[in-house]
């Protein structure tokens, strides 16, 4: 049955990286050398927990329990979950409490929030499998919807996810791919046959024993998502101040089957501070939606509801992502220092695997986190301020220096054959 009023699919990305400490050249090769700034990582996590995670989870708990047609979805990176255990067990407990409501879906991603999908199918599959297992251990769910790091997506990746056993995948609704199509409509990737070598690697490492017969693509409605995530407190924006009833009007007028609002969870309380009214805005939405017959559904529910709909093809021959105005890989792989850093890291894969040393493997994987490369971005113009806001370093070159010293130390730790 087709509904004239679209559903809302709310998905939140929850991630905190391990930021590199001020590594000196003289530190390289020291037996007890630690790559990450323990104090800074702890302080940032606890600050964001107080401003965002704990108050937002408490509000979400209230909303999902009060409103029968209000459900949400999260993707929690493996490194975020580790920081919960190290720095804030109460944050993890609040997510587990949400899971017990039965109205929250947890998605799969790469464990280390890594760029492994760009470099190594084997590593990518192993990280996804590790993440699926961790989500099951902590929340009792086996994720069947996949979202790649930074919403990086391509036709090939969609079919890799299908072969891993996933029924759905999230992607950015990029204008240059959509052309005149509505991102709220259901989509599928084009028919695509992966090389046999790739298929064999996936079968060896995948989280589920069987491939899915098909995979649906849920596209982020970036305009409506960014109205909340980026523009909510912008006094120069024509839509300021944004009220819940106005936003609901925009949602209802946007058409299609499911309005997919995907954003960082830190939108609430961290990027948009409490004094902007962001929590009051969030609190008001479910009641308005209930009055107007709008349901907030999980990604799995949205895909099930679209079974009777004709699905458009979302054809992404090259990678798209949810970063910056370009919505491509340039936030992590635009300049020479970014490309060199990632290339040199993955040149070590064979030697790291041969060493069969869990600590060495963990260090290598921790350096794959996308944030390390994001901090090396030298973009300016429209996106420069965003990159500066998120970076803990004074410059992209400082990010590269710290990463290079960690990489040099890692290289020295590999046994010489």
Residue ranges and their predicted role:
Residues 57-61, 92-96, 125-135, 158, ...:
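Generic structural signal for well-ordered alpha-helices
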Residues 91-108, 129, 141, 162-209, ...:
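Acidic, His- and aromatic-enriched active-site or binding-groove loops in soluble protein domains
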Residues 2-51, 65, 187-192, 197-199, ...:
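Active-site and substrate-binding clefts of carbohydrate-active enzymes
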Residues 5-12, 18-120, 144-147, 167-172, ...:
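Short, well-structured secondary-structure segments
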Residues 76-150, 213-233, 256, 260, ...:
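Metal-dependent polysaccharide deacetylase catalytic core of the NodB/CE4 family, i.e.
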Residues 129-188, 267-285:
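Catalytic domains of cell-wall/extracellular-matrix polysaccharide-remodeling enzymes
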Residues 20-23, 83-88, 118-120, 149, ...:
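A short acidic (Asp/Glu
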Residues 13-17, 77-79, 111-114, 140, ...:
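An acidic- and aromatic-residue-enriched active-site/binding cleft used to recognize and process polar
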